[in-house]
């Protein structure tokens, strides 16, 4: 699925040796299946692992990937390019921008959950956060809840209005309103 060169694997092993024990690697795609798709690699602590993640085994480390983006990672490669100037990781995912997965979700709730998992949560996961759809009320209000680094973050108002709400209302015209039902408590888990 993801071919990681020996040089890149050794680079990851070196980086992970400087992180807290149990820290692994996460591969993600922001806006998968669109022309704006962007691939990325980040650290993944044990607390960041989700039930829907797939664990890939490599020499001395694991890579976690959200199950919903697997089709976009077909034939992907991560390599470490070393030259006179320095070194740089390269990540090639030829299917990242293709609308490769079929939308099989039947209900509005399933379609919004898929949308959040594929388009919003990859961005929020870079800050250790996530947004969940709790339910859709009878008056077509989407009730959502933020978890992880988003809970108690001082930027949550901007994230809610400028990213989550704007995108849900734009992609799902049947939704009239988005309400955040998170009990925001600022703490060490909060990103800002």
UniProtKB/Swiss-Prot annotation:
Q: Name one GO biological process term.
A: iron-sulfur cluster assembly
Kindly list the cofactors needed.
Answer: [4Fe-4S] cluster
Q: Which GO terms describe its molecular function?
A: 4 iron, 4 sulfur cluster binding; iron ion binding
Task: Tell me the InterPro entries matching this sequence.
Answer: Fe/S_biogenesis_protein_NfuA, FeS_biogenesis, FSCA_dom_sf, HesB-like_dom_sf, NIF_FeS_clus_asmbl_NifU_C
Q: Sorted alphabetically, which keywords does the UniProt record give?
A: 4Fe-4S, Iron, Iron-sulfur, Metal-binding
Q: Which residues bind [4Fe-4S] cluster?
A: 150, 153
Is the keyword Cytoplasm in the record?
Answer: no
Q: Could you say which residues form the signal peptide?
A: none
Cofactor annotation remark: Binds 1 [4Fe-4S] cluster per subunit. The cluster is presumably bound at the interface of two monomers.
Q: How does it assemble?
A: Homodimer.
Query: What is this protein's function per UniProt?
Result: Involved in iron-sulfur cluster biogenesis. Binds a 4Fe-4S cluster, can transfer this cluster to apoproteins, and thereby intervenes in the maturation of Fe/S proteins. Could also act as a scaffold/chaperone for damaged Fe/S proteins.
Family from the record: Belongs to the NfuA family.
UniProt-recorded name of the protein: Fe/S biogenesis protein NfuA
Question: What gene is behind this protein?
Answer: nfuA
